[in-house]
């Protein structure tokens, strides 16, 4: 089975299932010399961790263990292996519905591809959002590496259940979402109202995450098939429950005239740059030195307490299923950290390919540490 690895020069492979013994990631291509500890990984994992208000009540501590690739507190240039053990597993919930694939989930697709007898029905198995904890652990490594370039990657919710929330104008503002349980920049009472209503209806809501790479350098991305926006699209659409991807103004540009849809090219600080973010900081799929802005849409959580039509996979008799278990009323809240992580992983891969990051060894200085502290100082 392929499809478990992303990246060329800086690659991340995730492994494990929702109700297995553990999940984890193997990072290959991380240069030597990067200070790295399990506490660094926890900085990011704490924002994705389940068990908080308006998230799944499954209480996973998400404590990572670095098994390889780090010596005397710094990366060695060898593969970094990370394991996160599953602690709060209740597989009995799924015994009642293992013969009735859940509507909206990957159950039916996995059954058709791998066969019913090989399908791990417990909590969604490999297709579960639980897998994304491994991505966030790897994303912490990528974010630290980007600090060497002065790049900050931050995301926030701009839409929840059809209610819109503001975007950020700078890195400092965007990082405020890290302290919000709803991952919004303001108006938390509006977000809480949306989620309370969904819970009262025994339903769920979707949303949109916006993420920005601030101080991104020019030259990330290759022509044609390895464009930066193409790799970002692949990374974002690989996240469970993602259903749409935009760069800059995205689909809005399709409704404008050419005279309205272009970013101006101006002279600023002794160089040519773009004014505006309609193109999302990329032209021809290559970064131009402006902030790179993307959006990812997430569907509502499919596991809800409202019955839906399905079939018994053995008899093919139509029936209804009401999904038990512990689930998020809005997966988009915890998806923010996953979007940031995948964003950072893709940027590091392209930075190494572009020669902007040394693939063998990095020199960690005070400027790198200052960038990392922007994340570490904003943990709830």
From Swiss-Prot:
Recorded catalytic reaction(s): these are: 5-O-(1-carboxyvinyl)-3-phosphoshikimate = chorismate + phosphate
Q: InterPro entries under this entry?
A: Chorismate_synth (IPR000453), Chorismate_synth_AroC_sf (IPR035904), Chorismate_synthase_CS (IPR020541)
Q: Which UniProt keywords apply?
A: Amino-acid biosynthesis, Aromatic amino acid biosynthesis, FAD, Flavoprotein, FMN, Lyase, NADP
> What CDD domains would the database entry show?
Chorismate_synthase (cd07304)
Which residues take part in binding FMN? Answer: 126-128, 284, 299-303, 326
Superkingdom of the source species: Archaea
Amino-acid positions noted as binding NADP(+) in the UniProt annotation, renumbered to this chain? 48, 53
Top enzyme class, one word, equals lyase
Pathway(s) served: Metabolic intermediate biosynthesis; chorismate biosynthesis; chorismate from D-erythrose 4-phosphate and phosphoenolpyruvate: step 7/7
As cofactor, the record names:
FMNH2
According to its UniProt record, what is one Pfam family this protein matches? Answer: Chorismate_synt
GO biological process terms on file: amino acid biosynthetic process; aromatic amino acid family biosynthetic process; chorismate biosynthetic process
* Assigned EC number: 4.2.3.5
- CC terms in the record's Gene Ontology section: cytosol
Q: Recall the GO molecular function terms of this protein's record.
A: chorismate synthase activity; FMN binding
Q: Kindly state what the record says about how the cofactor is bound.
A: Reduced FMN (FMNH(2)).
Kindly give the PROSITE patterns that the UniProt entry links to this protein: CHORISMATE_SYNTHASE_1 (PS00787), CHORISMATE_SYNTHASE_2 (PS00788), CHORISMATE_SYNTHASE_3 (PS00789)
Q: What does this protein do?
A: This reaction introduces a second double bond into the aromatic ring system.
Spell out the family assignment given in the record's similarity comment: Belongs to the chorismate synthase family.
By its UniProt entry, which HAMAP family does this protein fall under?
Chorismate_synth
Q: What is this protein called?
A: Chorismate synthase
The gene from which this protein is expressed is aroC
